């Protein structure tokens, strides 16, 4: 995408804007406390030097205290011409930089890392692939979170691996049955790993009536079988809890 000119990026080192020969960019916080803060002067000068800041004025500070980064936010950012990401270090940055420059604070999760560069890389990678021309729209439409649900399981050759066979429906050529199987498996995975997304889809009105009916049949373990004697059809097999002896 970079070679094709679809996207471009630039890296700015705030140490290049420090005032002393040691390129000092941090100091102890007022009021005491552990750790160091990035100094406002070199960071501010670094931001002033960025052409994207001059053009768009859209600056993001990557911090654990920011709003959660989501696929929806990534899609929103992908439509902007340019964005600027501030990568924090140590205990963070001076609040005055946030007040003066920052438009939004974003967090990639409820955990703390040693620096913001890795978090910024996550945001960049998530956003740039949504830019027109980077990845086909069909691939994006079927990914996890693009339709409020996690993506269904994927299989490729060989047909049998370590005794495990690819579900026969996927090679049946019946596109409608394949679609139903994928929706079913997507719902199954979402209910197991991220049930909150189901509720969100209901709230947003993106969960279809077909999906709701499938959810009504799901238990902890659901399998898909292909009836060879009749036309391909979905058969939902509910798991039974084994007698624990209690």
Segments and roles (model prediction):
Residues 10-12, 58-60, 83-84, 104-106:
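Hydrophobic/aromatic beta-strand patches that form the interior of the parallel beta-sheet core
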Residues 118, 130-169:
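Internal, active-site/partner-interface "lid" segment
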Residues 14, 62-65, 87-90, 109, ...:
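Fold-independent oxyanion-binding glycine-rich loops
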Residues 1-50, 176-199:
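N-terminal nucleotide/polyanion-binding subdomain common to many enzyme families
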Residues 158-246:
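SAM-dependent methyltransferases
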Residues 37-89, 95, 132-133:
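S-adenosyl-L-methionine/SAH cofactor-binding core of RNA-modifying enzymes
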Residues 97-143:
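Structured adenosyl-cofactor binding patch, chiefly the S-adenosyl-L-methionine
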Residues 34-37, 68, 90, 94, ...:
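Gly/Ser/Thr-rich beta-alpha loop segments that engage phosphate groups in nucleotides
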């Amino acid at each position: 995408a970079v070679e094709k000119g679809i996207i471009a990026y630039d890296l700015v080192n705030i140490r290049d804007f420090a005032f002393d020969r040691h390129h000092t960019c941090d100091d102890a916080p007022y009021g005491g406390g552990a750790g160091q803060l990035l100094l406002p002067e070199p960071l501010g000068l670094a931001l002033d030097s960025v052409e994207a800041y001059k053009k768009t004025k859209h600056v993001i500070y990557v911090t654990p205290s920011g709003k959660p980064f989501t696929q929806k936010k990534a899609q929103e950012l992908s439509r902007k011409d340019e964005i600027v990401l501030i990568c924090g270090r140590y205990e963070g940055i001076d609040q005055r930089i946030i007040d003066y420059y920052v438009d939004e604070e974003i967090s990639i999760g409820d955990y703390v890392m040693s620096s913001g560069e890795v978090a910024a890389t996550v945001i960049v990678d998530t956003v740039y692939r949504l830019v027109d021309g980077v990845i086909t729209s069909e691939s994006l439409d079927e990914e996890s979170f693009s339709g409020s649900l996690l993506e269904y399981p994927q299989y490729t050759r060989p047909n049998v691996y370590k005794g495990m066979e690819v579900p026969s429906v996927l090679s049946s050529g019946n596109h409608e049955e394949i679609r139903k199987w994928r929706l079913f498996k997507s719902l199954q995975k979402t209910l197991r790993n991220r049930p909150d997304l189901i509720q969100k889809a209901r709230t947003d009105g993106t969960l279809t009536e077909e999906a709701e009916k499938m959810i009504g049949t799901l238990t902890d373990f659901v399998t898909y079988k292909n009836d060879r004697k009749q036309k391909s059809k979905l058969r939902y097999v509910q798991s039974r809890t084994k007698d624990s002896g209690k």
